[in-house]
Structures are given as C-alpha cells and as structure tokens.
Design a protein with these regions (language model features):
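Bacterial N-terminal signal peptides
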Residues: 9-19
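Short helix-capping/linker turns of helical repeat alpha-solenoids
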Residues: 72-73, 144
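Bacterial Sec signal peptide processing site at the extreme N-terminus
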Residues: 21-36
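Bacterial N-terminal signal peptides that target proteins for export
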Residues: 1-8
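Short coil/linker segments at helix-helix boundaries
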Residues: 34-61, 80-167
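Surface-exposed, polar/charged faces of alpha-helical domains
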Residues: 61, 68-72
Length: 167
C-alpha cells in the first residue's frame, strides 16, 4: 500500500523529465486529467467496498492522489474528506494517525467551504472578528455545500474529542 503511494511521485517525475522538461501543454494537462479521473474511479471502486479495511485504506490513498491532481473537484474532495473520517474512526488504531486523518479531512472540507463564492460573500460582508465573519459566511453558504460543511465539522469534532480543554 505504501509502495503504491510512494511510487506515484517518481512516476510523475520520470514522465516530466522524459518528456524533455517542457512546461505542461494541453496534451499534458489532458493526460493528467485522465490519470486523475482513473485514480478517482479506482478510489470510488474501493470506497464502495470499504467493508474490507484494506479497501478502505486503498480508497483513501487513491482519492488523496486524485485530489492532489484535481484539487478543484469538490465532489472528489468531499469524498476524500469522508474517507479520512471513516479511516480515522473505524480503521486506524494509532491515536496520532487517527488525529492526522481527522485533521486532513477537516482541512480538505474547510477549504471547499472557504473557497465557495457564497461563503466569501458572507465572510467579507462584515468587518468583525474572524469567528463572526466565519459564521456569516456559513449563513450565506449555498445548500450544495452542506456536505462539505458536515465533513468539516465531523472531522474537527473527532479530532478535538480527545484533546484536553486546557493545556
């Protein structure tokens, strides 16, 4: 599993250098999009079979790599955030790794919400402190972003649940 994830960057680097070190052309972008689509498809395939812990882990790996290639795809990002939550809650046993998964899912989902136009409109409408601005942004959020908002809060809640109130 780790071998697969560690090989992907080397393959991409090899492709870059073997192609003459030129900048991305339209054909290169199309190839990256095709690779991302294939990785997303594999991630969804394993996600549908997440009853098997190995499949849940593979789904998260494929979805994370696809997300790195296509960070603007909100549905992919939401699924990746959900996979982080699932693996952190049900699969992973080591507390530090659980926290890492919950934080990853939190940051992904929060990024979706923060980059939405409706959130930004509400967020920038007031000049108060950041908490009030954030609440205004959430109030202005379109209904289509509710799943991202849910996974933002679910991942953050699971991360914070075992943390001390005062250190």
């Amino acid at each position: 599993m780790k071998n697969l994830r560690s090989q992907i960057p080397f393959i991409l680097i090899f492709n870059f250098f073997s192609s003459g070190c030129h900048t991305l052309l339209d054909t290169d972008r199309n190839l990256l999009i095709q690779q991302a689509d294939h990785l997303e498809k594999k991630g969804r395939y394993y996600w549908e079979r997440r009853i098997n812990p190995d499949h849940a882990k593979k789904a998260q790996i494929f979805l994370s790599i696809a997300y790195e290639l296509k960070p603007e795809a909100d549905n992919l990002a939401i699924l990746y955030s959900q996979a982080c939550y699932f693996n952190g809650l049900y699969i992973e046993q080591i507390p530090e790794k659980k926290d890492s998964l919950f934080l990853e899912g939190y940051h992904i989902a929060k990024g979706i919400v923060y980059h939405s136009k409706s959130f930004q409109k509400g967020f920038n409408a007031v000049e108060d402190n950041n908490l009030i601005r954030e609440l205004r942004g959430i109030e202005a959020l379109e209904k289509s972003f509710v799943p991202a908002l849910y996974w933002w809060v679910a991942n953050l809640g699971r991360y914070l649940i075992n943390k001390p109130v005062v250190e």
